[in-house]
Amino acid sequence: MSGEPTDEDLEELRKKKMEQLKEQGGEGQSEAAEAQRQQAEAQKKAILRKTLTDGARKRLNTVQMSKPQFGEKVEQQIVALAQSGRIQGKIDEEKMKELLQEMKPDSQSFDIKRR
């Protein structure tokens, strides 16, 4: 084998280098996205801490334990209300109960009639 690389060798090296660069670029983007997600999560937690009383926070945590998707939806609603300025003061446990009742998905009931 001679000391000079062939065209095929050069092309293979280029492909490997391009793949490495793509991977490195992808890692940087995913790290930035992760950092942005963490920052948004921290901001959401701060807003919830500021707007909810201890009792309301406990009730929300209980809802999240039993129904995580519904709990997340309630959190998003509270954050949206707080950011738009539609919440005066703090949300106590009674207001949280009302909010949960309003947001509760309609349960489907089935009437079975026997003949």
Swiss-Prot record:
GO molecular function, one term: DNA binding
Biased composition (Low complexity): 29-41
Keyword field: DNA-binding
Biased composition (Basic and acidic residues): 12-25
Cellular-component GO terms for this entry: cytosol
InterPro entries recorded: DNA_bind_arc, PDCD5-like, PDCD5-like_sf
Acidic residues compositional bias, start-end: 1-11
Domain of life: Archaea
Annotated stretches, region: Disordered: 1-46
Similarity field: Belongs to the PDCD5 family.
HAMAP family per UniProt: dsDNA_bind
UniProt protein name: DNA-binding protein NP_4416A
Lineage per the UniProt record: Archaea, Methanobacteriati, Methanobacteriota, Stenosarchaea group, Halobacteria
